[in-house]
Structure formats: structure tokens, C-alpha cells
């Protein structure tokens, strides 16, 4: 057991803040079907409260014995309670984390690193979302641990408003990203101006 603890310590960054623990995952891992507000987005006609952000997202999954998406999804279900970043941008962070984890990981020692570098278009409902010109630098480690297994997620997201042409962030409703957004309780509503688009409520 002590050997496992030493191995685990090596795949954590020494400069990260104290990780947030998460309770044990359930045994079942039912396939989640997306709610109707997650719809494929087409070209937006409304420019109301629409902003382009250049985003960088890194999610590093650390586990000496490998990991399953069942555990990652369980960790993300506690996201609202353990999120330590700017709450005006929590919706943006959830979108970036979901898109990053739906990509292919790059092995890095005993870590698996998911990266996202993209300019994305976000729309917030009413007066929600970040302040004009507001930027985000968010970093947090979240862990799940018991006597036999350890899984740590190191999440880093940076975002700044930019004028480069962006892409719509919503993708195939049957994608892994939509499952992860549901796990993180991403709050959206259908736009009245663009019936095929979703507005962030957080």
C-alpha cells in the first residue's frame, strides 16, 4: 500500500492546491440520453450577448492502475460543489472540460492528458456570464481515492475574449461531451432567436 501511495504522489504536481475529495462511484454506469436543449447548433443569426473566447483546456487524468470513464463521470457529478474558479464562467469551464475529455488523450508517464485549443462562440442568457473583457485562469485538482484505487483529475482552463472567428461549441447530441455536460449539470436553455442554439444560464 505504501508503494502505491509513493507512486500516486509522483503523478501529482507539487504546486497544486489541496485536492477536493469525491465519494465512491455507484456500480452502474447507465448510458445517458441528452435532454432536448442540447441540440446541434447551426449558424447563429442573433448576436445578443454573444462572445468569442480563445480557450485552452488541459485535463490530466492520473491513475497508477488505469481508469475508467465511469469514475471520471462520477467525479464530474460533484463539479458544482467543488468548483473553485470564477462562478461567472463556470458554464464556460464545463463546456471546455466536456469537449476536452471527448477527445483523444496523450499518454504522459502514468498520466493521460486531454487538451483543447480552440476559439469558441458562447452565448449567455440575460445578464449572465463573465463581465466585458474578463479573463479566466482556473486550475484545480479533484481526486477519488480508496484503499485499492486512486484517480486524480488536474483541470486547467484559461479563456480570454478575442476577435478571431470562433466555432459553435455544441456538438453531436449523442457525443461523450453531452454526457459529461449532463454529469456536470450544465445549465442551458434554447434560444428564442435561434431555435437550434443553446444559451448558457451559468
Curated annotation (Swiss-Prot):
Main localization of the protein described in the UniProt heading: virion
Residue segments, region Disordered: 12-33
GO molecular function: structural constituent of virion
GO cellular component term of the entry, any: membrane
Marked site: Involved in the inhibition of stress granules formation and contributes therefore to virulence: 95
Biological process annotations from GO: viral budding via host ESCRT complex
Pfam families reported for this sequence: Rhabdo_M2
Glycoprotein keyword on record: no
Effect of residue 158 to G: In strain: Isolate AVO1
UniProt xrefs under InterPro entries: Rhabdo_M, Rhabdovirus_M_sf
Misc: Most abundant protein in the virion.
Family that this chain belongs to: Belongs to the lyssavirus matrix protein family.
Annotated function: Plays a major role in assembly, budding and uncoating of virion after membrane fusion. Completely covers the ribonucleoprotein coil and keep it in condensed bullet-shaped form. Inhibits viral transcription and stimulates replication. Plays a major role in early induction of TRAIL-mediated apoptosis in infected neurons. Inhibits the integrated stress response (ISR) in the infected cell by blocking the formation of stress granules.
Record comment regarding domains: Late-budding domains (L domains) are short sequence motifs essential for viral particle budding. They recruit proteins of the host ESCRT machinery (Endosomal Sorting Complex Required for Transport) or ESCRT-associated proteins. Matrix protein contains one L domain: a PPXY motif which potentially interacts with the WW domain 3 of NEDD4 E3 ubiquitin ligase (Potential).
UniProt-recorded name of the protein: Matrix protein
Native source species: Rabies virus (strain PM1503/AVO1)
Gene field: M
